[in-house]
Regions:
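C-terminal juxtamembrane segment of a hydrophobic transmembrane alpha-helix
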Residues: 10-39
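N-terminal export/assembly leader peptides and their processing motifs that target proteins to secretory
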Residues: 29-141
C-alpha cells in the first residue's frame, strides 16, 4: 500500500505540473496581448482628447455642371494629424480629397481640394480626422 500511495502522489504531482505549464504557456501571451492592447487604447483615447480641428473657410468654384471645393482645416489641438487618413463628406457622401500637405501640425492649416462634386446650393461639409474627431461646416452660396 505504501508504494501505490507514493506512485499516485507522483502521478498527481506530474499531472499538476503539466497542467500549470499548459495554462501559463497559453495564458501569459494572452495577458501580454491584452496589456499591449490596453496601452494602445490609452494612447488612442489620449490622442482623441487632444485633437481639435476647425474648418476655417470653404470656397466653391464652378467646373462645368459640377463644383470644386477648397476647404481649409486648422489643427487647433496638440496632436499632429495625418491627412491621408482624413475623410471628407459632402451632404453625407464621402468624396476623395487631396490635401496640400501630408501632415497638419498643431496650430497649422491644411488645404483640402475636392473636384467634380455634383451638389449645388446649400452644402453640409464634414471633415473627420484620422482618430475620429470631426468638424462640420454649412456652405451657402
Amino acid at each position: 500500500m505504501g508504494f501505490s500511495l507514493i506512485a499516485s502522489a507522483a502521478i498527481l504531482a506530474v499531472t499538476l505540473f503539466m497542467a500549470v505549464e499548459i495554462i501559463t504557456g497559453a495564458l501569459l501571451p494572452t495577458l501580454d496581448g491584452i496589456n499591449t492592447s490596453y496601452g494602445e487604447l490609452k494612447n488612442r483615447i489620449n490622442d482623441q482628447l487632444q485633437t481639435h480641428i476647425n474648418i476655417t473657410t470653404v470656397s466653391r468654384s464652378a467646373n462645368g455642371g459640377n463644383y470644386n471645393y477648397n476647404i481649409s482645416v486648422q489643427n487647433t489641438g496638440s496632436v499632429t494629424l495625418k491627412t491621408e487618413k482624413f475623410a471628407v463628406l459632402v451632404n453625407g457622401v464621402a468624396y476623395p480629397a487631396s490635401c496640400s500637405c501630408a501632415y497638419i501640425y498643431p496650430q497649422n492649416i491644411g488645404y483640402f481640394t475636392l473636384t467634380n462634386i455634383t451638389s449645388g446650393g446649400a452644402t453640409r461639409i464634414k471633415i473627420i480626422s484620422d482618430n475620429g474627431i470631426a468638424d462640420y461646416y454649412m456652405y451657402t452660396p
